[in-house]
């Protein structure tokens, strides 16, 4: 019998990227709507990507077996 392939979690694949270094990159939340009352400084900070650490990075890597 053929070996069963692992499936990629599509929701995680759209939200996270595993880099060559092994870090998991993600974009920040609170940036899609209701932006008029948020300051320019805050919106500028939200544009930048950030990285997951520790247990949460390990969990996401498990959901993305081929990345």
Curated annotation (Swiss-Prot):
Gene3D superfamilies attached to this UniProt entry: 4.10.410.60
GO molecular function: structural constituent of ribosome
InterPro entries the record matches: Ribosomal_bL35, Ribosomal_bL35-like, Ribosomal_bL35_CS, Ribosomal_bL35_sf
Pfam family, one: Ribosomal_L35p
Entry's Gene Ontology cellular component terms: cytosolic large ribosomal subunit
BP term (GO), one: translation
Keywords per UniProt: Ribonucleoprotein, Ribosomal protein
PANTHER family: 54S RIBOSOMAL PROTEIN BL35M, LARGE RIBOSOMAL SUBUNIT PROTEIN BL35M
Family per record: Belongs to the bacterial ribosomal protein bL35 family.
Name this protein carries in UniProt: Large ribosomal subunit protein bL35
Organism listed in the record: Caldanaerobacter subterraneus subsp. tengcongensis (strain DSM 15242 / JCM 11007 / NBRC 100824 / MB4)
